[in-house]
Amino acid sequence: MQASAAFPKAARLLKTDEFSSVFRLRPWRRTAHFVIYGKPTGRDARLGLVIGKKYAARAVTRNLVKRLAREAFRTRRAEFAGWDILLRLHARFDKKAMPSAASAPLAALCAGEIRELLDRAAREVARRNGAKPASE
């Protein structure tokens, strides 16, 4: 599948039962702020995001995280064909280290962690599919 510039509704987890079926599984990997889960489906790759107010109180921050995650997934969607991927924020960001709710350091931190998790998830998907990851 060729990665396109669009991120259609079909590429997202939307319903509660879709999220629940992925959440029931053990998390694959963690970073300081995020956890990633995956579930084989045999269909096109889909992304679910759980960015709660408990860990990102300001809407600006939640929207920034979601935008970065969607873009990172959209550009690598072909690597996750046949899988539902769920990304969850599980820790607060240090307010003292981040000058504002949508600062460049916060965006860089989130983008780096999301990229790292997607790299690990792509390797896990490739391992479970019995193929070599595209990055090797």
Curated annotation (Swiss-Prot):
Consists of a catalytic RNA component (M1 or rnpB) and a protein subunit. Gene3D superfamilies: 3.30.230.10. It comes from the Bacteria. Belongs to the RnpA family. GO terms for biological process: tRNA 5'-leader removal. GO terms for cellular component: ribonuclease P complex. Keywords: Endonuclease, Hydrolase, Nuclease, RNA-binding, tRNA processing. Its EC number is 3.1.26.5. InterPro entries: Ribosomal_Su5_D2-typ_SF, Ribsml_uS5_D2-typ_fold_subgr, RNase_P, RNase_P_CS. It catalyses: Endonucleolytic cleavage of RNA, removing 5'-extranucleotides from tRNA precursor. This is Ribonuclease P protein component. It holds the Pfam family Ribonuclease_P. RNaseP catalyzes the removal of the 5'-leader sequence from pre-tRNA to produce the mature 5'-terminus. It can also cleave other RNA substrates such as 4.5S RNA. The protein component plays an auxiliary but essential role in vivo by binding to the 5'-leader sequence and broadening the substrate specificity of the ribozyme. The gene is rnpA. SUPFAM superfamilies: Ribosomal protein S5 domain 2-like. GO terms for molecular function: 3'-tRNA processing endoribonuclease activity; ribonuclease P activity; tRNA binding.
